[in-house]
UniProtKB/Swiss-Prot annotation:
A GO-annotated cellular component: cytoplasm
Function, in words: An aminoacyl-tRNA editing enzyme that deacylates mischarged D-aminoacyl-tRNAs. Also deacylates mischarged glycyl-tRNA(Ala), protecting cells against glycine mischarging by AlaRS. Acts via tRNA-based rather than protein-based catalysis; rejects L-amino acids rather than detecting D-amino acids in the active site. By recycling D-aminoacyl-tRNA to D-amino acids and free tRNA molecules, this enzyme counteracts the toxicity associated with the formation of D-aminoacyl-tRNA entities in vivo and helps enforce protein L-homochirality.
Main location: cytoplasm
Subunit: Homodimer.
Organism: Bacteroides thetaiotaomicron (strain ATCC 29148 / DSM 2079 / JCM 5827 / CCUG 10774 / NCTC 10582 / VPI-5482 / E50)
Gene designation per UniProt: dtd
EC number, UniProt record: 3.1.1.96
Stated name of the protein: D-aminoacyl-tRNA deacylase
Keywords on record: Cytoplasm, Hydrolase, RNA-binding, tRNA-binding
Keyword Glycosyltransferase: no
Reaction catalysis annotation: glycyl-tRNA(Ala) + H2O = tRNA(Ala) + glycine + H(+); a D-aminoacyl-tRNA + H2O = a tRNA + a D-alpha-amino acid + H(+)
Cystine residue pairs: none
Family (UniProt): Belongs to the DTD family.
Motif Gly-cisPro motif, important for rejection of L-amino acids boundaries: 138-139
Gene Ontology BP term (one): tRNA metabolic process
Length: 150
């Protein structure tokens, strides 16, 4: 699984002109799933996300997790995170999982992340044409890949 975490002041996702989800201060997470992903990847990411210290403490130092800061999370599925630009100029998405694999994993990821956070999270709709709005805070943007745990 590959994710992009952005610290935001607020974020929302709109589908067909209707706001599906919106959050205040917290994280916007874009998530891409590949064929070989499974529960181990979900578990590692959920633990890492809720404990990631990217929120400022009283001294202005990024020393607090979203659990400590009380922020919200909005998760958006994004198969394009697995784009390969190795050949030519048109990205290939061959590494992205097909919907029959990625939809259940995305839903499980959202459910498990909500449980780890201790409250409901916002989500987009898998496969929909979404308009995502956000106000980056910092900006702070962190990329994580369960196949390359650095």
């Amino acid at each position: 699984m590959r994710i992009v975490v952005q610290r935001v002041s607020h974020a929302s996702v709109t589908i067909e002109g209707q706001c599906k989800s919106s959050i205040g201060k917290g994280m916007l997470i874009l998530v891409g799933i590949e064929e070989s992903d499974g529960q181990e990847d979900i578990d590692w990411l959920c633990k890492k996300i809720v404990n990631l210290r990217i929120f400022d403490d009283e001294s202005g130092v990024m020393n607090k997790s979203i659990l400590e800061d009380g922020g919200e999370i909005l998760v958006i599925s994004q198969f394009t995170l697995h784009a390969s630009t190795k050949k030519g100029n048109r990205p290939s998405y061959i590494k992205a999982a097909k919907p029959e694999i990625s939809v259940p994993l995305y839903e499980r990821f959202c459910k498990d992340l909500s449980r780890a956070l201790g409250k409901e999270i916002g989500t987009g709709t898998f496969g929909a044409d979404m308009k995502v709005e956000l106000l980056n805070d910092g900006p702070v943007t962190i990329c994580m890949d369960t196949k390359n745990k650095e």
